[in-house]
Amino acid sequence: MFDVLMYLFETYIHTEAELRVDQDKLEQDLTNAGFDREDIYNALLWLEKLADYQEGLAEPMQLASDPLSMRIYTPEECERLDASCRGFLLFLEQIQVLNLETREMVIERVLALDTAEFDLEDLKWVILMVLFNIPGCENAYQQMEELLFEVNEGMLH
């Protein structure tokens, strides 16, 4: 499922291709690209739920907004988000790429992923997808994109 999301993000969203694609055509394109029908369905459902945030149909879990409060992760969250992922989320909050609401959206979307393997690089892409879809997060999206691509470009040299 995560492979389908990555493919969609890179092919349709990140490249600013036509964003209004007929769902049947999209499913056919993904099938032709070699993706499993169940993975396609799950990825599209995942994106629909993400779009609910954009349209105001879903709200992230509301937490205390005291700047001195600390987010305690549940065992399920710790299982999916290892220490490096949790540390990265904290870092993004500290540099104001994420706020309490967007952090919770990211965590919720990570937990909704149907994948056994999940690492820091995957988290970065989920964060990009969430920020891309939330109105008013354009600057945060740009900062996150710079963080993602600067680190990856640095690894190539």
Swiss-Prot record:
It holds the Pfam family DUF494. It comes from the Bacteria. It comes from Escherichia coli O7:K1 (strain IAI39 / ExPEC). Belongs to the Smg family. InterPro entries: Smg. This is Protein Smg. HAMAP family: Smg.
